């Protein structure tokens, strides 16, 4: 820890931090725009100015940008001195010269960083009476709105989109005093994290179009902490509703999971909840083939009578349903009459994942993934099946830049300087997938193989790491050599795989590689991505009962819990379902 003096008071702050971060952590109000805790400092907005004094005798001091200043022991600063407050007010007045002052109709109104900072510095008079600079807005797709006239050129948007998320179709364009942030031409933003522009932008340049369709101010929304069900990563979210409809989903900061960012599937993928086609009350199928709406009490009584009159009742759970719901169904029908709803290949794959989770190999969270210095991806398109994990992998490739910065004693929060130093130097990322991968642009080695060959590759790498290369094939030898060397050179390697190829051998090979690295005393991690949000939970409840066997046992009544069996099962299973006397479906869709 480091001790600094601010306006005559001593504060103990984190060593190595920049001054702005230290001041904010100490509870002091310092306005800022361009700095972001996940993206570091570039000193673009000049809003975080404070005064630094050379020593105790210095009463004049000099204005410095706190986001670009490292904290040092016994350094003396002032946030409240007149020269600092006057400078900050003049900066925000200059930023507001061309701003449209359209807060009453702006979607950011009431939760706008620019509003907060303007009030904080005390700027309330507008002296400028000239013409404002104006821009034409772009169409950026159905999810994100664009109002360029509100821009204050903080550069957060392009820094996130290009530098952090790896996007290439959003840039800064400038001529004289006109700076424009957008695409080269109208079109849908391609990056799967584009929705974070809404959060990253401190003004209302990028807005949530799905919210704008039925806009509601923040204070009129009822919000609750939730967990995203878009994949199995468990990102933390806030879901907000009004008048019984979901209006928006926002990222909820969780330092060990999703941090500050959320994928677009998680942010914009909840629209199905408001569908008019959802069955929102209990119904009983009549003889005419139509559903008759009944009260929940009557529906429960009807199901109770069905169960009482049945000789054989089975329950089919689901990886979409919660652990509590699956356990309740299991308790209702009995251990021998319950299955978790997975087909055999899914049960086999998730059994492998559970075995790995029970082993002594580390299974890092998404934040921890960013600390690994070499990553091997076997068979899994993580950008599509675990998008937030892919963003963490992209950050992990910058660990070589972190090493270079440490060698030159350059602070990591000096983002532009670190990127300039590293250029294209990246930590090893090796990808073996059946199709092109969105992470190929930062991959050291990227190869396209069939699922069977990917499994063979994994086993060959594990054998080579153990000094037993008998399973090497001529076609894979060069890849095995390259990957083995990179993993051997790494201090902290990570192996990633998943269920998207429906090949259990790929998962076994990934676990085998991780085990081989662990045997050589490497600080090894393994991430095996599950199919659905609660696949691991129901895999832990697995009692080895298969779905086909249970349906073939001639049940009178089948209770299906949040499982879309029609789309997931074979024709034979569908025919078995059609012959069931009593079919009870419990779902939220």
Please identify what each model-predicted range represents.
Residues 46-229, 233-237, 242-246:
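Fe-S ferredoxin-like electron-transfer domains
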Residues 1-2, 11, 35-37:
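Ubiquitin-like/PB1-type beta-grasp interaction modules and other compact soluble beta-rich domains
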Residues 19-53:
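A basic, amphipathic helix-loop patch mediating RNA/tRNA/ribosome contacts
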Residues 9-17:
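Short, contiguous acidic and Ser/Thr-rich linear segments
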């Amino acid at each position: 820890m480091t001790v600094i003096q601010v306006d005559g008071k001593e504060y103990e702050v984190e060593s190595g931090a920049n001054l702005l971060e230290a001041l904010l952590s100490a509870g002091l109000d310092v306005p800022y725009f361009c700095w972001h805790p996940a993206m570091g400092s570039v000193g673009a907005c000049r809003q975080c100015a404070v005064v630094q004094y050379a020593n105790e005798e210095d009463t004049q001091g000099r204005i410095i940008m706190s986001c670009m200043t490292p904290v040092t022991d016994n350094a003396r600063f002032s946030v409240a001195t007149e020269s600092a407050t006057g400078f900050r007010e003049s900066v925000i007045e200059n930023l507001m010269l061309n701003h449209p002052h359209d807060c009453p109709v702006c979607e950011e109104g009431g939760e706008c960083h620019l509003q907060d900072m303007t009030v904080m510095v005390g700027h309330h008079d507008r002296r400028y009476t000239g013409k404002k600079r104006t821009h034409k807005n772009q169409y950026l797709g159905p999810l994100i709105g664009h109002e360029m006239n509100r821009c204050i050129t903080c550069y957060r948007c392009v820094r996130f989109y290009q530098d952090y998320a790896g996007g290439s179709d959003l840039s800064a364009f400038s001529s004289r005093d006109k700076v424009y942030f957008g695409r080269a031409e109208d079109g849908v933003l391609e990056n799967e994290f584009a929705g974070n522009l809404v959060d990253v932008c401190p003004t209302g340049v990028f807005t949530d179009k799905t919210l704008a369709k039925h806009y509601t101010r923040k204070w009129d929304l009822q919000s609750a902490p939730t967990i995203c069900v878009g994949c199995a990563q468990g990102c933390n979210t806030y879901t907000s509703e009004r008048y019984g409809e979901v209006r928006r989903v926002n990222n909820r900061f969780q330092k060990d999971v999703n941090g500050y960012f959320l994928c677009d599937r998680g942010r914009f993928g909840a629209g199905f909840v408001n569908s008019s086609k959802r069955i929102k009350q209990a119904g009983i199928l009549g003889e005419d083939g139509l559903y008759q709406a009944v009260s929940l009490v009557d529906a429960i009584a009807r199901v109770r009578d069905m169960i009482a009159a049945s000789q054989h009742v089975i329950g089919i759970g689901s990886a979409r349903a919660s652990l509590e719901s699956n356990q309740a169904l299991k308790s209702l029908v009995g251990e021998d009459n319950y299955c978790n709803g997975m087909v055999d290949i899914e049960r086999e794959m998730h059994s492998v994942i559970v075995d790995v989770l029970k082993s002594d190999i580390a299974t890092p969270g998404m934040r921890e993934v960013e600390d690994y210095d070499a990553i091997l991806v076997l068979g899994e398109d993580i950008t599509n099946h675990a998008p937030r994990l892919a963003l963490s992998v992209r950050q992990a490739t910058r660990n070589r830049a972190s090493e270079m910065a440490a060698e030159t004693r350059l602070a990591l929060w000096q983002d532009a300087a670190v990127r300039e130093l590293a250029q294209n130097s990246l930590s090893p990322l090796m990808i073996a997938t059946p199709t092109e991968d969105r992470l190929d642009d930062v991959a050291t080695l990227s190869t396209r193989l069939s699922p069977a060959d990917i499994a063979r590759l994994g086993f060959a790498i594990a054998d080579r790491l153990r000094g037993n290369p008998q399973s090497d094939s001529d076609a894979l030898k060069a890849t095995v050599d390259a990957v083995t060397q990179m993993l051997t050179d790494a201090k902290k390697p990570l192996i990633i795989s998943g269920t998207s190829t429906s090949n259990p051998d790929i998962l076994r090979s990934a676990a085998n590689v991780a085990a081989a690295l662990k045997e050589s005393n490497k600080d090894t991690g393994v991430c095996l991505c599950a199919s659905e949000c609660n696949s691991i939970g129901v895999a832990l409840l697995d009692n080895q009962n298969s779905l086909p066997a249970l349906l073939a046992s001639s049940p009178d009544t089948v209770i299906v819990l949040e499982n879309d069996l029609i789309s997931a099962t074979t024709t034979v299973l569908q025919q078995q379902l059609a012959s069931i006397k009593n079919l009870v479906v419990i779902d939220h869709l």
